[in-house]
């Protein structure tokens, strides 16, 4: 039996409105992004990396800032 797949291509905007709402970007965090759903009026957190990856990036960023002497932090 042959499997036939029929997909419709939709734009990002059409996809964001599929459930009747739109996700509005709020801020990026160490392990993900925070959005606000305009339909449900609730905040949505989408994890983009695991806890170990977030901790490792935080440590490395701290080391890099220390190595640069806090360049750009004191104006």
UniProtKB/Swiss-Prot annotation:
Keywords from the named record: Antibiotic, Antimicrobial, Bacteriocin, Host cell membrane, Host membrane, Membrane, Plasmid, Secreted, Transmembrane, Transmembrane helix
Predominant place of localization: secreted
Superkingdom per UniProt: Bacteria
Protein name (Swiss-Prot/TrEMBL): Bacteriocin lactococcin-A
Single Gene Ontology BP annotation: killing of cells of another organism
Function (record text): Kills Lactococci.
Upper classification of the organism: Bacteria, Bacillati, Bacillota, Bacilli, Lactobacillales
Subcellular localization, as worded in the UniProt entry: Secreted; Host cell membrane
